């Protein structure tokens, strides 16, 4: 087990079907035999709207999610909860969605 192996199984798992295009929910492949993965993980999700009536609310949500996905935010979570930081690939996917919030 390593944090990178935990993040790798999430990256290697397909997106769940039937969800909106701003969803990164995964169907975790817990039976994977792919090298470098550790399939026993618990994934936490952050939920947000893609549009807000109040632009200030949208900016606050974007700032919060940007921090949560940032390297600093992930390191803080890892230290406090022992969680595995998300990969750079996942961070890029998250930020693409966060940047589209209005």
Please place each PLM-identified region on the residue numbering.
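Flexible, solvent-exposed loop/hinge segments that line or gate ligand/substrate-binding clefts
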Residues: 1-71, 78-102
